[in-house]
Amino acid sequence: MLLKGTPVAERILEKLKQKISQSPTPPGLAVVLIGNDPASEVYVGMKVKKAMNLGMVSKAHRLPSDATLTDILKLIERLNNDPTIHGILVQIPLPKHLDSNVIIQAISPEKDVDGLHPVNMGKLLLGQLGGFSPCTPAAVIELLNYYDIPLQGRHVAVVGRSNIVGKPLAAMLMQKHPTTNATVTLLHSQSQNFTEILKTADIIVAAVGVPLFIQENMISPNAVIVDVGISRVATNNDKGYMLVGDVDFNNVVTKCKAITPVPGGVGPMTVAMLMKNTWESYQKSSS
C-alpha cells in the first residue's frame, strides 16, 4: 500500500482555507531566507505561495549570505514585535558562519511555527500542551494516523537523530497518548546490530539523509516504511537528476506492508503542518 501524503495534505489545507476565509483578519507567516541556496529558494517560494493560496499574508525576507548575526537578530526582533505576523520560519541550512541555535532561540516561542525553539522542544519532551510540534515529525504521525496504522504498543525504529526530525519524532511517538504510545528505538551511525534491530520494527521511519540507505534485506516483510529523506541523484534523463528518498523504494515496495512515496509522501504533509501551526498561532493571539 502506498501512503500518499498529497491527498491528505490537501484535505488539511482545504479545511484551513475555509477557517481563514471566515476570520476577520488573515494570519501572517514570515519566512527568512539567508543566502542564495537554490534548493532553499525553491522551498521558501513554495511555502510563501502555499500560505497565500490559503488566504494568509506571507512574505519572504531575504538577507545576503554574508549577513551578520546582528542583522538577522534585528529582523527577527522586528518580526517578533509585529502583531500581524503569527509565524516566523528561518529556512535551514544557514551559511556556515551562522549559529542556527542562536537564531532559532531569538524567535518568540509563540511564533516558532517550525517547533524548534528550546521552549517548544521542552514542552514536547515533557508532554505539555501549548507548544508547537516540529512540522516533519508531526507530518509523520498525522500520515500514519490518517491511514489507520496503529502506533500504540508497536515497535517504531527511527533511523536518524537530528534535532529537526529524529529526536523530536522519537519524543512524540513515545508520548502516552492514544494516537502514539509506541515503543521507540532511535538508530544512528554508531548503533550496534543495526539491521537486526531494524528487522524487528513494525514501523520504520527513515530520516538519515542518505539516498537509498534502507535496503530490502534490512526490513521485515510486514514493516510499514515512512521515508522522510529527499535527495537529488544524477541520472541520464532530461532533468539530469531524479528525486529519491532514504529508502530503496523500487526494491523495498514489493516486500513491505506499506510505504510512503518520494516525492509525494511526507513532504506535502510537512508543509501542511507548517500552515496548521501558523493558524494555531493566529488563534492563540486572537483569544
Curated annotation (Swiss-Prot):
Q: Which residues bind NADP(+)?
A: 160-162, 189, 230
**What is catalysed by this protein?**
(6R)-5,10-methylene-5,6,7,8-tetrahydrofolate + NADP(+) = (6R)-5,10-methenyltetrahydrofolate + NADPH; (6R)-5,10-methenyltetrahydrofolate + H2O = (6R)-10-formyltetrahydrofolate + H(+)
Gene3D superfamilies per UniProt: Leucine Dehydrogenase, chain A, domain 1, NAD(P)-binding Rossmann-like Domain
What pathway or pathways are given for this protein in its record? Answer: One-carbon metabolism; tetrahydrofolate interconversion
Q: Name one Pfam family in it.
A: THF_DHG_CYH
Question: Where does it sit, as one GO cellular component term?
Answer: cytosol
Which PROSITE patterns would you find in this protein's record?
A: THF_DHG_CYH_2
User: What domain of life?
Assistant: Bacteria
Which keywords has UniProt assigned to this entry? Answer: Amino-acid biosynthesis, Histidine biosynthesis, Hydrolase, Methionine biosynthesis, Multifunctional enzyme, NADP, One-carbon metabolism, Oxidoreductase, Purine biosynthesis
Single GO biological process annotation from the record: tetrahydrofolate interconversion
GO MF assignments: methenyltetrahydrofolate cyclohydrolase activity; methylenetetrahydrofolate dehydrogenase (NADP+) activity
Q: What is its EC number?
A: 1.5.1.5, 3.5.4.9
Which NCBIfam families did the record assign?
PRK14181.1
Kindly state the subunit structure of this protein: Homodimer.
**Per the similarity annotation, which family is this?**
Belongs to the tetrahydrofolate dehydrogenase/cyclohydrolase family.
Q: What does this protein do?
A: Catalyzes the oxidation of 5,10-methylenetetrahydrofolate to 5,10-methenyltetrahydrofolate and then the hydrolysis of 5,10-methenyltetrahydrofolate to 10-formyltetrahydrofolate.
Q: What is this protein called?
A: Bifunctional protein FolD
Species of provenance: Chlamydia felis (strain Fe/C-56)
